[in-house]
Amino acid sequence: SPYAFTKSKNIELLENLKKWFNFKFEVIFFYNVYGPKQIKVGDMATVIGIFENQYLNKKPLTVVKPGTQSRRFTHISDTVQICYEAFKADSCKYYGISNKNSYTILQVAKMFNSRIVMTKPRLGERYASALTNISSNNKIIQKYGKLQLKDYVSSFIKSRKLWK
């Protein structure tokens, strides 16, 4: 894919800059970040943000068929903490930030205890959560978030019930 190609070329460029000019960097790969102030509408909206918006507007949650697409979701607090740790390390490393748990999109929708509507499959839909792998001499340091998606969604729903 163009995305994978670009990512590969950018990594290659960073490695060359490090070799030629002693350039310092930390590369961090994010996986489905969610949390307060996430984007809830539009092309850049997150899955969790879209579901929150649909829930708040009392609309059915839309899940792209077949719903078995799996993803790893990482809370923004975990993401920021690990970014800070990587910045402090200052070691020209590659990091992947995710959660150990993977959920299908349908499982996530069901966490909201709301009506679900299945929509047509999309071209180019990714069906599995793919953790980044680099095929050069560089190994990705996998970091896992501590905050759990189920707890976040449960807290979101409880806080909305208090508003009523």
What is the predicted function of each stretch?
Residues 1-2, 26:
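Conserved Rossmann-fold NAD(P)-dependent oxidoreductase catalytic core, especially the SDR/UDP-sugar
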Residues 3, 31-45, 65-76:
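Glycine-rich "substrate-gating" loop/helix at the edge of Rossmann-like oxidoreductase active sites
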Residues 6-9:
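Active-site helix of classical SDR
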Residues 11-37, 62, 116:
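Conserved beta-loop-beta element that borders a ligand/cofactor-binding pocket
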Residues 17, 51, 82-86:
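A short, amphipathic alpha-helix embedded in the catalytic core of nucleotide-handling enzymes
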Residues 43, 47, 51, 132-133:
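Activation loop
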Residues 56-164:
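C-terminal substrate-binding subdomain of Rossmann-fold SDR/epimerase-dehydratase oxidoreductases
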